[in-house]
Amino acid sequence: MVLYKRKPILLPDPKPLPLDLNVQVWHIEETGEWFSSYEEFLERFDFYTRHHFTCEITGTSCLTFFQALDSEETQFKYVEDRFPLKLREPVARFLHFNGIRRLDALVEKVYARFKNDFFPGEVVYLRKQKDSSTTSSNSQQSTPQPDDMVEINSVGNPGLPQYQYQRRYVIKEKVQFNATINPESREIVMPAHTKYMLIEEAASSNKSFIVDQGQIYRDRSTFTKHLIKCFFKITLQRASSKMGAPWCVKPEYLAMYGLTMEWPKDMLKYKEDEPVVARRSNSANVSSPESEKNKRQSKSSGKSNTSNDASNKKETKKKRKPTEVNDSENNSSEEDKKKGQNVTSETHSKKRKKEANEEPNTENVESVPTPANAEPQAVTITSIMDDLALPYQHPPNIFPNLTYYNEKLECISLGSTKLSRPFDSFGKLLQAYQFLNTFGSKICLSHFSLDQFITSLKCTDPYELKGEVVLVNIRTQTSKEQEIENNGLPMKNKAETTTEEDSENPSDWQRNSFIRDMIMKRNSDKVEYKIVHDDPASDDILDNINHNGSALLIEVFTALLRLFINEEGDWSCIVVENWIIDDKGVLMERKDERGEGEAKQKRNAHGYFLQDKEKIDNLKDTLKENATEVQKESDAKNETNSESDSKSDSDSEERDPKLEKCLNYRNVNWIERLTKRQFNNSYWLIILLGVLEDCRHLPMYTEFIDSFIEKIIPKDISATQLPKQLWRNFCRKLSFSDKVNALWILVDLVSHFSPDIKAAVDDSMELCGQIRSERFKVARELKTEAAVLSNLQGDLQAIQEKLNKTDENTPSADGADKKDDSESNSEPIDLIIIEKKQKLIEEQDKKVQALQSDKNFLDNCLFENDLQRLKPLGLDRYGNRYFWLDHNGVPFPQYPAGMNETPKSNNSLSYHSGRLLIQGPKASSAKFFLNVSDEQLSNWQKIRNSEGISEATREVFGISKTSSGSYNYVENGIEVELLDSNDRVNPLIELTPIQKKIMDETPSRLLLSPDQWYCIDKLEDLSRIMDWLDNWGRKEHDLLRQIRPIMERIKSSLSLRDHALSLTAFTKNEEKLLKELENNEFTENELNVDSMDVDDKNSGVKSEVDVQVDAEEKREAVIDEKLEVIADELMKLDDSSKTRNVLNRIQELEDQRDELLEQKKSIINSQRPGARILARSERKRTKISRGNKVNKQIEILTDLVNYRHFKAMEDVIAWKNVLANSIWGSSLRKNASGNKRSGVIETVDDKLKDIVGQTSRTVTPAPN
């Protein structure tokens, strides 16, 4: 039966004949359909002629209906003509409820089982024997030989090939003999065999012969694996829809072969639990593919055709649902539609079964105003279908736990209350990072993680290098009063806070959210905590690239720039010079004399070839064939182009003097610097400017390159400090997005035009093919050795069972003397055999483990050396794409020896990205899967950029989430609840795909653009995503098939990153700082000491003693200040040279110090003891203690806020380009050049030899 979308199709029932039999109709002969209108006939015929059908017997796909039908008829006739009739019933009995599930394995099993087994009635031929005198002892007469035959076989089926000098024989009888066993030694004397009685097919003689199975054979063309497989396709089907169900004979062939559908006891678990409702739904009704689009459109029609009156809408829903359910029982296509709308499933998946078995909450059910006939009848989902056609369950509450990167490249949780703008160039950052690590061995760049790459990029920002500062302010009574007077603006205590400039620069960073929230929660009426930016890094810190973390980013730029020109000065990455865009938006090469003249002028002006013309000509073959047509169109528009060219030329003239001065700094052209590999001291930026200037003619880069050059070139070019000026402008004036775009342009150019990268891809394909070959050999050897190990274990078990039986049957002591001596000596012999078997098993087990280790190692090598373009793992139901960067081309992550200890650096844990990435759908996918228009997408994007995702979702799609957790939909002023706070769907509303997506992802986290990326970086979030994906949906089924084989690798990668970054726990240093913070908490007395001073001042008139004490305290404070000034000056004089004037000044200061100390001592002695004086002294000590705690808390909290960021910077600083150091002895940014050191593995054969050398195999592959 022809298959459509992997389901057997059922032709529609024939229509009744028209009343007027003379009317002309259009007829499709193959299906028997007729049509009264040509449009209907043409639509149906067009459906049949699409290449969407599959031949069920051969499995050939992409056929038209007629081709598939013809293929099936041809194959069916082929099986009927060739496959022996007498062999069909035994084969069918063997296949019926067979335990082998895989079809290819079953074919091999049947071929091996029946190759030498024959049945009465079959036509066979005799084999030629070496010794013609040999006859069977049991024969009635001698067996005939083919050489004795002189007649040509001409009797029988004329369709079969006729063999000369051979006669055809028919098996008359078949007798099977059991094996003959020696009763004493228990050895097999004669194995089991079969005898056949043959008669000649021609009825001319009555001779019969007795032969065994080794003397006869079938015609080779009548018993082949292809015929067996075709017979399977015709005869067999799955016994049930359950996973792992066995094969069984189709109902129409059961009576023919004398079989029944009685299930074996060991297979009853695969039997259907209950009869499937609407069995016809398993077969695809022959309807045009437009019906599927109509299904999607019907779901969205609820939004476009909503009535202004809500009550009318509900009434129509009530009337429509019962009729739709009734129609679904009679029409399979209508049933499929209902499955996609409101029909719930009990056996949809494991989680659907669980929900169906749970008893509903009666309280919740009563609160929903659902009509009695509104609930449709539940049906069983038995096949994979469209994801959005599955019944909607409830929001998974997964997306708030995921993370994303904001515009400051901070990893922020989506559940954060303050959602900032995402990083728009994150996709380009991932492309550049994946390219750098995939081709790291080719461009001499060691591996680094995605976190290290992002941290190095952030280390080029002056504020990131200094971090943040936590300010602590003790609020006094006067500051509170002033705060009220200034309408809530707090005044700062000058004694215990920093300057006003720091407080005017509050931090808007969101990293390290737990510590940040902990600090802000410490705010109270008496203490104020603030987090502000520290002063930006100075020029000295920015220039010290070896110790500020930016060395990794510079090494990356340097590695890419090296690919454009080799050390001989030849261009190795050739970009076609002149491009234009045709009317269709396709980039084309521009062939005109004007472009060639400009190239010559550029070449003559600088003295260097910007591009090699001969190599450019070789690339012209790859361009479009219609370039000449574009040339004609461009000639017609020369006038308009000349005006724009003149404007661009005038703009370039304004830029050219400064740019030329940079590119020819110190009279050395940038090409010469690149040839000589002069990257050190920020010369790489001059080379970068030259490469970007050379690619400015490409229209997709022009706007950015102009902006980049304008920002990075200084206004006043220094004759000696230009590279440092460029580097400081690169750090201060360029945003993270600008730096990523500059890097991405280099990656894009190299990946498209570099022959080195293309050669690396070709070598990778060749190497992977040889690794697969080695892995196949290891797997084959592993299978053989595992079978030997299994046999040894079976022999050992049999011997042990034999010993156990002898122990059980040991006679009593009275009969022990009657036992023979031979039997008493058998036990030591068996024990010796057991010891030998155990030794053999241990040795064999080591072989198996070594081969298994080799196979795993080769699997990892295959992942590491596969440099193919990274592809998404698949799509979910809403078109979101899933990526895992560790899938190919990167080293396999390895756990360290001690996972319980916190690593000193992330370099010891070789993880790659450590997360699963989700990208929003493309515009085409959103329009196709979600039925969203271009206008809605553009409006949503504009509002999202200005007001946020939540507001854009509410204005464009009319859906918002209330404070109670319910989702409301507003259209034409009518508000309808789609989902209540208990996650129950409104049964009166048919949800559209976009509505389901908004409720699943929440309005504030909606993924509707390819620029949006979410990260899954925790194991529990990964488990939730896997549980949410539905195996019965087409797209998610394919996605799960891709994720499950690499699930363990994904989990290990996430665990490695979690352990390296301590995402879910504090490190030891953080715990130590938190403990110190607890020891420096303010006491109640320290917080209230200022209010005690105010109470004393407000208590009334001071006494003479109080006045005297205050005066003495002021004198003492003045003396303390003078003593501090003298101490500072003495320290400076001690460090200077000891001249006479300096010594005299030191003596004077020491005399002044002694005098002030005497005055202070006299003041202290003059104070008389008293309660008021003691209280003042106590308050003074309390203030000093509080001040010390304030300074300590500032230090501890500042360290806590910056700890993880500074730790990441330390990891990046510790990164070294080990690969470049091993090849040239220095990093790429330090002008690594010259001949490579010996021992560098570059060729495919050397790489394969190195890989095989790390396995236990002794045979190495020979070079080609």
From Swiss-Prot:
Coiled coil: none annotated. Residues 280-289, 299-310 have a biased composition (Polar residues). Residues 130-153, 275-374, 482-508, 627-655, 803-825 are annotated as: Disordered. Keywords: Chromatin regulator, Nucleus, Repressor, Transcription, Transcription regulation. SMART domains: DDT (SM00571). Residues 23-130 form the WAC domain. One of its GO terms (cellular component) is nucleus. Its main location: nucleus. Residues 423-483 form the DDT domain. Residues 132-147 have a biased composition (Low complexity). GO terms for biological process: cellular response to pheromone; chromatin remodeling; negative regulation of transcription by RNA polymerase II; regulation of DNA-templated transcription; subtelomeric heterochromatin formation. InterPro entries: DDT_dom, WHIM2_dom, WSTF_Acf1_Cbp146. Functions as a component of the ISW2 complex, which acts in remodeling the chromatin by catalyzing an ATP-dependent alteration in the structure of nucleosomal DNA. The ISW2 complex is involved in coordinating transcriptional repression and in inheritance of telomeric silencing. It is involved in repression of MAT a-specific genes, INO1, and early meiotic genes during mitotic growth dependent upon transcription factor UME6 and in a parallel pathway to the RPD3-SIN3 histone deacetylase complex. Present with 2610 molecules/cell in log phase SD medium. Component of the ISW2 complex, which at least consists of ISW2, ITC1, DLS1 and DPB4. May form a stable subcomplex with ISW2. This is Imitation switch two complex protein 1.
